[in-house]
Swiss-Prot record:
It comes from the Bacteria. Its cofactor is Zn(2+). One of its GO terms (molecular function) is tagatose-bisphosphate aldolase activity. NCBIfam families: cbbA, PRK09195.1, PRK12737.1, tag_bisphos_ald. Dihydroxyacetone phosphate binds at residues 181, 209-211, 230-233. GO terms for biological process: D-tagatose 6-phosphate catabolic process; galactitol catabolic process. Belongs to the class II fructose-bisphosphate aldolase family. TagBP aldolase GatY subfamily. Forms a complex with GatZ. The active site is at residue 82. Binds 1 zinc ion per subunit. It is an enzyme of class 4 (lyase). The gene is gatY. This is D-tagatose-1,6-bisphosphate aldolase subunit GatY. PROSITE patterns: ALDOLASE_CLASS_II_2.
Length: 284
């Protein structure tokens, strides 16, 4: 079986001092880029999809595609529910075969966040499904969820331990100054906060909003305990811009098999760089 949960992947990363990248995909071509690049570099990767992606492509279609590509390349893959908020939606996808879940109740008060997450954990662990949850709240937009910068909240290290112990989660997404989307200027990450969280919580830690971060910042977060790096916007931007450029230069182009190649190539460069930044090449 080539489609797995993220639990062992992230535990291996925690022991090995590297991070596993979670790449948000949107269609066949973006999935091809991620899987082919990961297989060529022998790197562990996570195929992530927001609720919008699963609605667009269909859960059964995505699962079948991931399974087929994992088997084709003899490469273990995890398909992961990114920023899912509804219990019934998560339960349906788990019953369909998903083995890695992020339940995002970070917008709720602390006690309600715990309650919502624990409900999902109790259900998912019956199916050996790994669960990630978020404490604190990132600014920016992910799918249809918009969080103003003023409403973004950093993770409280002491609360993080209570949250992890009360919910039984397998990994914790932290808020230390990143945001969803691309940055107009380099963000000021709170490395001391991350170091403090690591002292209070022994679970694999997750960094969302990594698109556009410098190699130096990514590698510093890994040294301080980040085991999973989420990248979405940077992939979409590189793919879309290359496609726009190609069609502008070749207005006569009508065959997707031709004009999508430049988009895939541009995205492949981003995937390769993120894998290198995460230090996970050769770790699969």
């Amino acid at each position: 079986m080539y489609v797995v949960s993220t639990k062992q992947m992230l535990n291996n990363a925690q022991r090995g001092g590297y991070a596993v990248p979670a790449f948000n995909i949107h269609n066949l071509e973006t999935m091809q880029v991620v899987v082919e690049t990961a297989a060529n570099l022998h790197a562990p990767v996570i195929i992530a999809g927001t609720p919008g992606t699963f609605t667009h492509a269909g859960i059964e279609n995505l699962l079948a595609l991931v399974s087929a590509m994992a088997k084709q390349y003899h490469h273990l893959l995890a398909i992961h529910l990114d920023h899912h908020t509804k219990f019934d939606d998560i339960a349906q996808k788990v019953r369909s075969g998903v083995r890695s879940v992020m339940i995002d109740a970070s917008h709720l008060p602390f006690a309600q966040n715990i309650s919502r997450v624990k409900e999902v954990v109790d259900f998912c662990h019956r199916f050996d499904v790994s669960v990630e949850a978020e404490l604190g709240q990132l600014g920016g937009q992910e799918d249809d969820v918009q969080v103003n910068e003023a409403d973004a909240l950093y993770t409280n290290p002491v609360q993080a331990r209570e949250f992890a112990e009360a919910t039984g989660i397998d990994s914790l997404a932290v808020a230390i100054g990143t945001a969803h989307g691309m940055y107009a200027s380099a963000p000021a990450l709170d490395f001391s906060r991350l170091e403090n969280i690591r002292q209070w919580v022994n679970l694999p830690l997750v960094l969302h909003g990594a698109s556009g971060l410098s190699t130096k910042d990514i590698q510093q977060t890994i040294k301080l305990g980040i085991c999973k790096i989420n990248v979405a916007t940077e992939l979409k931007n590189s793919f879309s811009q290359a496609l726009k450029n190609y069609l502008t230069e070749h207005p006569e182009a009508t065959d997707p098999r031709d004009y999508l190649q430049s988009a895939k190539s541009a995205m492949r460069d981003v995937v390769s760089k993120v894998i290198a930044d995460c230090g996970c090449e050769g770790r699969a």
